[in-house]
């Protein structure tokens, strides 16, 4: 796909004279364009749901969720991956973010990195990619060689693959097994895909990882019941989670958390089923860590 024909490279009539308006009007123009992004994501919800189901199947079987991108797309993948361990208590290697140019590229532009097909393949090889893993290639344009080559390599290994881009029919979309293509239109600043396209990608990644965690039993109701208390704020959140899930007092919640080494799931089962920590943990283990199953089946 030629660059000049890409939707993400088009000129936006709404912002054609944005350099001549007041600061407030400038903000209104950007905000009006941003409002269109959730609607673009809404149109591809069935594609997102299909990807979540595949990711959950693979991860449940021992695989990993791997994000692969360059520039803004790569940084968004790293952001999403890095939030999964503290939020959901998963091991750091379960959700992985890879960026063209490596760690240095998280804060700096690395010239030519996104054009390296070899880089995309080597980065996946370096993390020991297996057929059980799912590779999600992220590229607003859908033409990034680093991402395309990585997806091709992943498919050769037998991995399930997902391509996220904002240009219909792009190479990323056609290379991946599952395509997620929120079409957000031309950017306020022509070609600045960190804006609407980046926002759309962030919304999609939020759904992919959150959907995976919900289906994996990491959420009870709407509570993050595997949250790791790494600071005072999260200690308080743990108490509130146990309170909200059980209706007990803050003192009861704290006592249960202390008794089970601050595991919200165990504390919730302890309170609701009137069990000690060891028995509550045993029952959770018997039901794969799903609180709902412990409560419904016993």
From Swiss-Prot:
- One Pfam family name from the record? GKRP_SIS_N
E.C. number:
4.2.1.126
Top-level lineage group: Bacteria
Q: Which SUPFAM superfamilies match?
A: SIS domain (SSF53697)
Any keyword Lyase? Answer: yes
Q: Which UniProt keywords apply?
A: Carbohydrate metabolism, Lyase
Q: In which pathway does it act?
A: Amino-sugar metabolism; 1,6-anhydro-N-acetylmuramate degradation; Amino-sugar metabolism; N-acetylmuramate degradation; Cell wall biogenesis; peptidoglycan recycling
Coiled-coil ranges from the UniProt annotation: none
Q: What induces it?
A: Induced by MurNAc 6-phosphate that releases the repressor MurR from the DNA. Repressed by MurR in the absence of MurNAc 6-phosphate.
> What InterPro entries does UniProt report for this protein, alphabetically?
Etherase_MurQ, Glucokinase_regulatory_CS, MURQ/GCKR, SIS_dom, SIS_dom_sf
Q: One GO molecular function term? A: carbon-oxygen lyase activity
Q: Which residue pairs form cystines in this protein?
A: none
Which positions are catalytic residues? 83, 114
- Quaternary state and interactors: Homodimer.
Report further notes. A lyase-type mechanism (elimination/hydration) is suggested for the cleavage of the lactyl ether bond of MurNAc 6-phosphate, with the formation of an alpha,beta-unsaturated aldehyde intermediate with (E)-stereochemistry, followed by the syn addition of water to give product.
Q: What is this protein called?
A: N-acetylmuramic acid 6-phosphate etherase
Q: What species was this sequence derived from? A: Escherichia coli O127:H6 (strain E2348/69 / EPEC)
Tell me the organism's taxonomic lineage. Bacteria, Pseudomonadati, Pseudomonadota, Gammaproteobacteria, Enterobacterales
């Amino acid at each position: 796909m030629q660059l000049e024909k890409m939707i993400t490279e088009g000129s936006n009539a709404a912002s054609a004279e944005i350099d001549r308006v007041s600061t407030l009007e400038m903000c209104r123009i950007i905000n009006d364009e941003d409002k269109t992004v959730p609607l673009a994501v809404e149109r591809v919800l069935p594609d997102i749901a299909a990807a979540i189901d595949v990711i959950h199947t693979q991860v449940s079987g021992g695989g990993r969720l791997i994000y692969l991108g360059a520039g803004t797309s790569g940084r968004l993948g790293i952001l999403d991956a890095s939030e999964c361990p503290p939020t959901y208590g998963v091991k750091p290697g379960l959700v992985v973010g890879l960026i063209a140019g490596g760690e240095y590229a998280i804060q700096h532009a690395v010239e030519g990195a996104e054009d390296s097909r070899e880089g995309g393949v080597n980065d996946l090889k370096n993390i020991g990619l297996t057929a059980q893993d799912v590779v999600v290639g992220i590229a607003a344009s859908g033409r990034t060689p680093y991402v395309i080559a990585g997806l091709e390599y992943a498919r050769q290994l037998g991995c399930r693959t997902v391509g996220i881009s904002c240009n219909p029919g792009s190479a990323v979309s056609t290379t991946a097994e599952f395509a997620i293509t929120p079409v957000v239109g031309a950017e306020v600043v022509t070609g600045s895909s960190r804006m609407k396209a980046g926002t759309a990608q962030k919304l999609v990644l939020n759904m992919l990882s959150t959907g995976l965690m919900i289906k994996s039993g990491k959420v009870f109701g709407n509570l993050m019941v595997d949250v790791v208390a790494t600071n005072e704020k999260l200690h308080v959140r743990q108490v509130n989670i146990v309170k909200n899930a059980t209706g007990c007092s803050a003192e009861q919640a704290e006592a249960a958390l202390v008794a089970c080494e601050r595991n919200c799931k165990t504390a919730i089962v302890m309170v609701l089923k009137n069990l000690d920590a060891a028995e509550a943990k045993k029952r959770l283990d018997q039901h794969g860590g799903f609180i709902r199953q412990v409560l419904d089946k016993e």
